[in-house]
Regions:
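Glycine-rich phosphate-binding loop of ATP-dependent small-molecule kinases
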Residues: 1-214
């Protein structure tokens, strides 16, 4: 089963990805992880990517495709995979389709987890972490027993810079701008499933299982 996971920041992507790969016994292919692995291992592809990153430039689509398809050629992907962070552009999606078609394969389902902007802002800006032990809380979903104080060690809870309103709004805007053309592309292909991401983590996963089958 070849899957793509589209999920905005704050919508529980990590949790759903972990549940999907465990249930369906397929590898989780995260673009970020592949890039880091190639760079760490000093591969030719990693060196090329590092040059662009060092220069503060975006890694070109062609190189992203090369790095992703190199990973998809590994043996553990022969019975399926869950793609996360790839494709990011229509060009990448088209190249992925060509790559899979050449192997007599295709993308079976694109899981689009949808959460409205207001809910995402609450989720992202409500996160608090302990300044000492790193324990994680949320002012709405997992509040500490005492406001602003860590349940674990009693230290002060802080809001990370990444979780402030401006950064959160920017992350959501970038995701929406990047993902809309992809959603349109897969709508035309007829292989996308839209999932309401506001129903709770377990309900979202049960919906995914209902779509993919047991």
């Amino acid at each position: 089963m070849n899957l793509i996971l589209l999920c905005p920041p704050g919508a529980g992507k990590g949790t759903q990805a972990a549940k999907i790969i465990e249930k369906y016994n397929i590898p989780h292919i995260s673009t970020g992880d592949i890039f880091r692995e190639n760079i760490k291992n000093g591969t030719e592809l990693g060196k090329k990517a590092q040059e662009y990153m060092n220069a503060g430039k975006l890694v070109p689509d062609e190189l992203v495709v090369e790095i992703a398809t190199d990973r998809l050629n590994k043996d553990d992907c022969k019975d399926g995979f869950l793609l996360d962070g790839f494709p990011r552009t229509v060009f990448q999606a088209e190249e992925l389709d060509k790559f899979l078609a050449a192997k007599g394969s295709k993308i079976d389902n694109v899981l689009d987890i949808d959460v409205n902007r207001e809910e995402l802002m609450i989720r992202l800006t409500g996160r608090r972490v302990c300044s000492k032990c790193g324990a994680s809380f949320h002012v709405v979903n997992i509040p500490p027993k005492q406001e602003g104080i860590c349940d674990v060690c009693g230290a002060e809870l802080i809001q990370r810079k990444d979780d402030n309103e401006e950064t959160a709004a920017n992350r959501i805007e970038v995701y929406n701008k990047e993902t809309k053309p992809l959603i349109d592309y897969y709508e035309k292909a007829g292989n996308i499933s839209h999932i309401d991401g506001t129903t709770g983590l377990e309900n979202v996963f049960n919906t995914i299982v209902g779509i993919l089958g047991e």
